[in-house]
């Protein structure tokens, strides 16, 4: 539970109060009353809380010492920039970013999100049974949120069950945009090492210089397979093993299916693998709806140019009765996430402060 404590240096900042949870100090705005800690990661601690002004339950994520690691600082800045623009039922909403007391020396960042009950990883590993309707509804919402992001030229690049939040009504929201990029960005990010390995598309594993929205579709396929089978479909131990597991399922590729591989060494590796006829997905998931298997087969296509698009996946017969194109308008404008990866800490700090001001216009006025 959350325990009210005195400020560590005895000096209380105006408009703040102090709580301890899981040996972590929360210095938060007085309008928020913490309830209990609900999650912990490399970034810090998340707690559930109530906004006393609106009586709304929210999740507060404390990112501790955000500037200790520049990569983490850039991830946080990227998430702030993206979520300020995004408004969609299937994307997590960032409600507030608390304004620290000191503009030039703050170390911690407090993000306030809408509160969800659990995530898809927890549901998959639980003993709770999942009907075909459950599987279909989760997939539909994931594709719907992704279609919106792709309409804004945003690649998520780190889709996995733990980044899909779910509530008691089975509503699903995509979260964690620290690795997201614009699909029309420069080549610098096109060669980065991204996405949790098990959900990583072949073109990323093969270090291709160019990739697009189809990387997210592959991740969706891996997630959907995991929903159907209650275990990861490609639990690779390292990059080369990951590719071998993929070929064992999708089968050895024709020359025409590996033209997208622009790295000669990577192409030679794929050609060197023992021949595999592949495994039909209906054998892996015999209880699954045949239409679900057909759609999954179209998502888990090795060649990204032949992989089904998000829009076509939503129009697939398995999604019949769920998708209404008119109720899923695109994002109003493309969102730019182009950030100079070599920025120094003071510049990143100032950019974060400016993002925070969008949630605190009164502070901007008082500082004018």
UniProtKB/Swiss-Prot annotation:
Q: Which UniProt keywords apply?
A: ATP-binding, Kinase, Nucleotide-binding, Phosphoprotein, Plant defense, Serine/threonine-protein kinase, Transferase
Q: Which residues form the signal peptide?
A: none
- Please state every residue range assigned to the domain named Protein kinase: 32-319
Cofactor field: Mg(2+)
Q: Which SMART domains match?
A: S_TKc (SM00220)
Q: What is its EC number?
A: 2.7.11.24
Please describe the post-translational modifications of this protein.
Answer: Dually phosphorylated on Thr-191 and Tyr-193, which activates the enzyme.
Motif TXY residues?
A: 191-193
Q: Which family does the record assign? A: Belongs to the protein kinase superfamily. CMGC Ser/Thr protein kinase family. MAP kinase subfamily.
How's its activity regulated?
Activated by threonine and tyrosine phosphorylation. Activated in response to hydrogen peroxide. Activation is triggered by MAPKKK17 and MAPKKK18 in a MKK3-dependent manner.
Active site positions:
158
Work out whether the entry's keyword set contains Methyltransferase: no
Q: Which GO terms describe its biological process?
A: defense response; response to hydrogen peroxide
| Keyword Electron transport in record | no
PROSITE patterns, alphabetically?
A: MAPK, PROTEIN_KINASE_ATP, PROTEIN_KINASE_DOM, PROTEIN_KINASE_ST
Q: Which residues carry this modification: Phosphotyrosine?
A: 193
According to its record, what is known about the domains? Answer: The TXY motif contains the threonine and tyrosine residues whose phosphorylation activates the MAP kinases.
Q: Summarize the subunit comment.
A: Interacts with MKK3.
Q: What class of enzyme is it?
A: transferase
Catalytic activity of the protein: L-seryl-[protein] + ATP = O-phospho-L-seryl-[protein] + ADP + H(+); L-threonyl-[protein] + ATP = O-phospho-L-threonyl-[protein] + ADP + H(+)
Q: Which Pfam families match?
A: Pkinase
Protein name, UniProt field:
Mitogen-activated protein kinase 7
